[in-house]
């Protein structure tokens, strides 16, 4: 057809590399990048999938809700611990081409710990957070992605990496709305 003749491009599939179908200009750009860059597979990094809560509406909260939880803390010590527990979070859709647009969302990081290194979060030490999560009890009690208790997030072997710098990809492909948060 005329369209194929006008738009067709040659792709060499004889090598052992993955198939990449690009226009001639895109192939040229790819070759230039590969000539000066280090392939991601050769970097000394680990790639993870992010946080799975099993119930985002309970564990991912707005700034307003965070402030409400902090205001409900009974002591200054509880407030300080709670501030450290509730961490800012970026979702895949918050990542833009050259930066990010933070949606002012926070993760209640009631993690399950890392055996032998980091203890599990005991919800009893965070009464204001527990009161918030209790509002979602029917949803959090039976979720598959949970830790030792329904209040804990699932086991995460790379918990220590959450406070390190990251490379974040903006397109997360998932059919499950409770997954895919970097």
What is each of the regions a protein language model found here?
Residues 2-182:
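Polybasic, glycine- and aromatic-enriched phosphate-binding surface used to engage nucleic acids
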């Amino acid at each position: 057809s005329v369209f194929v003749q006008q738009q067709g491009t040659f792709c060499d599939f004889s090598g052992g590399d993955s198939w990449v179908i690009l226009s001639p200009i895109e192939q040229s750009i790819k070759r230039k990048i590969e000539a000066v860059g280090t392939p991601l597979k050769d970097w000394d990094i680990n790639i993870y999938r992010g946080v799975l809560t099993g119930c985002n509406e309970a564990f991912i909260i707005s700034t307003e809700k965070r402030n409400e939880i902090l205001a409900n803390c009974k002591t200054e010590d509880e407030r300080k611990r709670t501030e450290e527990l509730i961490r800012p979070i970026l979702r895949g859709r918050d990542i833009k081409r050259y930066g990010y647009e933070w949606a002012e969302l926070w993760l209640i990081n009631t993690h399950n710990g890392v055996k032998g290194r980091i203890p599990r979060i005991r919800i009893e030490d965070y009464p204001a957070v527990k009161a918030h999560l209790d509002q979602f009890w029917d949803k959090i009690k039976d979720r598959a992605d949970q830790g030792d208790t329904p209040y804990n997030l699932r086991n995460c072997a790379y918990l220590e990496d959450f406070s390190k710098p990251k490379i974040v990809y903006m397109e997360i492909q998932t059919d499950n709305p409770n997954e895919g948060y970097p």
